[in-house]
Amino acid sequence: LPDSDIWREQQCKLPYGGELVNTDTRNTSYTARAQVDYSFQFLEDHQITVVAGTEARSSKYKGLKSTEYGYLPDRGEKFVEIDPVQWPKYGDLVKSHPNVITNTLTNVMSWYGTFTYDYMNRYIVNFNIRADGSNKFGQDKSNRFLPIWSVSGRWNLHEEAFLKEVMWMNMFAFRGSYGIQGNVSPDQTPNLLIQLGSFDPISKQYISKLSKLPNPQLRWEKTTSWNFGVDFAFLDNRLNGSVEVYRKKGKDQIISKEVASTTGSTTMQLNAGNLENKGYEIVLNVVPVKTKDITWALNINGARNINKVTKSGITTDYGYKEYLDGSAVIPGEALNTFYSYKYDRLDANGLPTFKDIEETDGITQTEMFAKVFAYSGTRVPDITGGFGTDISYKNLAIGGFFSYSLGTKIRLNNLYNDSGQRLPQPQQNMNQAFVNRWKQPGDENRTDIPVLTTDPLDMYGLGIDRKIKIADNGWEMYNKSDLRVASGNYLRLKNLYVRYNFSDRICHKIRAQMISVRFEATNLWLLADKKLKGQDPEQVTLGGVSTPPTSSYTLGLDITF
């Protein structure tokens, strides 16, 4: 065969036809509730409301997802039989996308009650209590039902007698709350789960494997939180908004822990993590201009959240991949914190080199990783928010909204594959960055893009006989080095609209209540780190490729009769 045909058979995943994906899901849910409400007033100004009830919920989800390859819809909806021996990549594709059957049952039993006291709509106190039980927890009866409760209060200052005559104050209030909440993930179970597989033609036996190890002590994730806020509205509501501060402490967070493979699995779900979140939220709305024909409104919102792992509950050392992808839960650091190799330079042959990767006798894995990796940041932003404006003149309205994000770091998409990089086949695309690659001795002084080569650059290629594994090869290290980390801060024009409402005279001609024409556009403009070079900062990946937010344009005509 010609070289191109040999390459095609070796590399092509789907030589003929397309994919036919069948998805069949059924969800059956039942809910039964009994509730009693009682409210009474005494001494004219005092109001008490009491609610008590119980609720039972059951939800059964069953689904089947299958993918068939070689589908020819234009040829009688037939399938091509493809030989996986001749087309090995096709065989890998089929193995990586097996048919999936989902069958889950979730049962929840709840009791709840509320007590509310209201004095002249001036002082309001509320107390809530609830107990939920779920089949997602273990045999320990003390862990099945978690009583969660909260107490909150509100002081409407604008209802006070000394502020009743302040005409410019429409509303001014303080509020606060304290309580305990519980959470359960639908993916968790205390029971031993065995995944029944298909038939193995080699051993002539059916295949089964452990999916989840049993944990009878599995219990609710608990969060203790408090918040304090101020709500206000002044000048006939032309200036209004709110400010809130909060703090949340999570306990018994469910995390994945590595266990000995002799148990039949490599991980186990445990209540072992503690997490703290604190921050504030601000919302402000202003109407600077409001006349008979013109209205101009501004709005802005922002939020800052700081999270920190106070306890990980993990005694087993993490592998290097957990540090790279941000899944390592490290006390004192934020969740989703990731680390990178320390890029040094290109050598005289155009190959990447890295700092502090030499192995020292007697060094532990944790100590080695602390030397090899550099802190890169977190994938979760510290500050998020947006601001916008709306302007209307008679029947014409124009508006837009910007969103922003600060404090996050992201990886650039992988530049090399795990076996290096070579010149592509004519039908393949290539990253534009390779235009500035190393091509000849001396180029290492002008570029940080390595040479095109088939050298796998494994750890022995780096000249290191490793006892503690820090990477699969040098190309993985380059892709996940601090050189390939960029700021995720951005300012985006999220949407823009223009709308025109036709006059009542025109509407009456066709007996319509309202006629309007509108144009809307989303994701029109982006200000971000130049280092991204077209990669979208909201395309949060750690080396993989995903589809960024796309721009869209809509022209519509709305008629209401």
Give the residues covered by each predicted segment.
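Conserved small-residue
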Residues: 65-72, 270, 280, 287-379, ...
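Short helix/loop capping segments that flank catalytic or ligand/cofactor-binding pockets
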Residues: 51, 60-62, 185, 339, ...
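C-terminal substrate/ligand-recognition segments
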Residues: 382-407, 482-504
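Extended hydrophobic/aromatic-rich secondary-structure runs
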Residues: 1-19, 127, 364-366, 375-380, ...
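Short aromatic-centered micro-motifs
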Residues: 117, 359, 391
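C-terminal beta-signal and adjacent terminal beta-strands/loops
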Residues: 167, 308, 363, 392-476, ...
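Extracellular/periplasmic, surface-exposed regions of secreted and cell-surface proteins
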Residues: 1, 12-333, 476, 480-561
